[in-house]
């Protein structure tokens, strides 16, 4: 599945890597969409941050950092047992994650 993505235009890919990864533009500023600069502090809607407790690709501490970066006070973190893929495909996740998302949305 890693290799199932479409080809990317070289310059667009370079710009994405430079702005999003190297410069951390959504945190530090510098990302422009259309004619508007955007960053995480501009988020004005409720945020539900779901992450896997045993994720080896996106460690929980990397996910938890979002709390201090978004501009919204309605912020919820939910962690689930599992790894990077297991949080989406395991039987337990299939029972727990969708219901949790439903409940969170229903409260808003």
Regions found by a protein language model. Name each.
Residues 45, 59-69:
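Short alpha-helix in the alpha/beta-hydrolase fold that links the catalytic acid
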